[in-house]
Amino acid sequence: MDMDSAHLDSSLLTLAFRLIKAAQTAAPSVLADLLAEGAPAWFQDDDLGWSCLHYAAERKEPECLEVLLQGGAVWNAVDKWGRTAGEICLSLGDEEGWSIIRNEGIRSEMLHHALSGTSSPDATNNIVLRAEDKTSAGDNLVFLKSKLTWDVGKDGKERVLDADGNGVMMGWEEPLMVEHVKRLTEEHPKAELGAEGMSILNVGFGLGIVDRLFQECDPKPSHHTIIEAHPQVLEYIHKKGVHLLPNVRILQGRWQDWLLDGEKVGDVLSGTPDGMGFDAIFVDTFAEGYEDLKAFFEVIPDILNADNGRFSFWNGLGATNPTIYAVSSSLAELHLEDVGLQVEWHDVLIPESMREEVWKGVRRRYWDLPGYRLPIAKMSLI
């Protein structure tokens, strides 16, 4: 919503600046009157890139925030430093104000999906959480044609970069993947010593960290399917001999090719016990947005074992901004509930050193938060 003031006629521009000024000191009724006159609530000033919502957040007056949001203020508009009004609230210790903005984000995103009438990953609607991006980092089809590079970062850990220098998979994520595998397998009856082992589905190989961790479990997986689409990653898989490991099966292609095709779903399930679904499913794709993740949610009931199955995903959408990250996580929880899954969240601390050193030599930083919200979803008990 960062629109140039040149697009406004003089009368609207005057109203926009009046609203910006009023948001700093005026009563909520004055803000409501200006909005009723047509003042553009999305407008951001040139000095700070602040909207009326940013200025109102600085006042710590919740009613002003509510009036502005009802009048069209944009909950996730960012200033010149990438901060939403929610971060202004957080910096001032205003939990109530932050909750108002977060809840509006959840409401507007849920409304977006309800009105879009589709969850297809090919839909033209772009979720507000993620702007349109036709680079290899923002478009999965572009990414699948891009050249990848494997190297070692300044932190001494292996990483995969795309042709634009964006991190596809980076070694710093391994402690988080350890937690994912731990939460997906702990106390599962098939993961106990002497048991037959779990059936695993992983979508998106990357550096193979999560697949290696699953293979290190005792007992090892009784079945382990990996869906991967990038040609170079598939070459890497064969170079490492992953496809030769016992009970491992590689399905080449996008997950949409396999799981949105009714006939192929049966092939995917063919290796699970009695074809009744996987015991653990993990998804971590690159250059896909929330629409794609939501579409994946909707196939989970068809491929997850209903009794003890667990599902998790790389929870990285909006992870450079705490307010957007909170909205994204809440939205995912609500949409998982829509398809019959209950989510438990596990908070994992990310050390400051890990958040700084790893980004040297990487074009686009995709993480900038002190904590990670790890989701574990299970089918709801009726």
Curated annotation (Swiss-Prot):
InterPro entries: Ankyrin_rpt (IPR002110), Ankyrin_rpt-contain_sf (IPR036770), Arginine_N-MeTrfase_2 (IPR017408), RMT2/GAMT_Mtase (IPR051038), RMT2_dom (IPR026480), SAM-dependent_MTases_sf (IPR029063)
EC id: 2.1.1.-
Start and end residues of each RMT2 domain: 134-382
Compartment(s) of residence: Cytoplasm; Nucleus
SUPFAM superfamilies attached to this UniProt entry: Ankyrin repeat, S-adenosyl-L-methionine-dependent methyltransferases
The keyword Membrane appears for this protein: no
Swiss-Prot/TrEMBL keywords: ANK repeat, Cytoplasm, Methyltransferase, Nucleus, Repeat, S-adenosyl-L-methionine, Transferase
Positions annotated to bind S-adenosyl-L-methionine: 143, 177, 205-210, 228-230, 255-256, 284
Pfam hit, one: Ank_2
Gene3D superfamilies cross-referenced by the UniProt entry: Ankyrin repeat-containing domain (1.25.40.20), Vaccinia Virus protein VP39 (3.40.50.150)
Main location: cytoplasm
GO terms under cellular component: cytoplasm; nucleus
Listed GO MF terms: protein arginine N5-methyltransferase activity
UniProt entry tagged with the keyword Lipid metabolism: no
The organism's place on the tree of life at top rank: Eukaryota
PROSITE patterns linked to this entry: ANK_REP_REGION, ANK_REPEAT, SAM_RMT2
Function: S-adenosyl-L-methionine-dependent protein-arginine N-methyltransferase that methylates the delta-nitrogen atom of arginine residues to form N5-methylarginine (type IV) in target proteins. Monomethylates ribosomal protein L12.
Description of how the protein assembles with itself and partners: Monomer.
Family named by the database record: Belongs to the class I-like SAM-binding methyltransferase superfamily. RMT2 methyltransferase family.
Protein name, as recorded: Protein arginine N-methyltransferase 2
Originating organism: Cryptococcus neoformans var. neoformans serotype D (strain JEC21 / ATCC MYA-565) (Filobasidiella neoformans)
